[in-house]
């Protein structure tokens, strides 16, 4: 899997640009790549920005439901609970072990 244009992918995830995120995923960006400068995953960053649609898209494309994002030191499920994103919490609760 390619890192591709990870910075643009990460920015699109944070901005909630579902179509641009999909474009980068289709181009082979590693969905679980940790941003080298921000030390965060796109999934946790999108969750923290309250981007439920992006978070669900990332999960649909194989984002790990258990990968701890280094900067935040939390799993996607922990981040979704903190952000009160019920749809994302429900999806992650089915996929991840209890935390």
Where are these regions (language model features)?
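Alpha-helical adaptor scaffolds
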Residues: 10-45
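Ankyrin repeat A-helix N-terminal signature
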Residues: 11-17, 44-51, 78-85
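Ankyrin-repeat boundary/"N-cap" motif
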Residues: 2-11, 34-42, 68-75
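Ankyrin-repeat and related helical/solenoid repeat scaffolds used for protein-protein interactions
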Residues: 40-74
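Ankyrin-repeat-protein effector appendages
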Residues: 1-11, 81-99
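Conserved ankyrin/ankyrin-like repeat signature
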Residues: 20, 53-54, 87-88
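Ankyrin repeat domain, specifically the short helix-to-loop turn at the C-terminus of the second helix
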Residues: 22-30, 56-64, 93-98
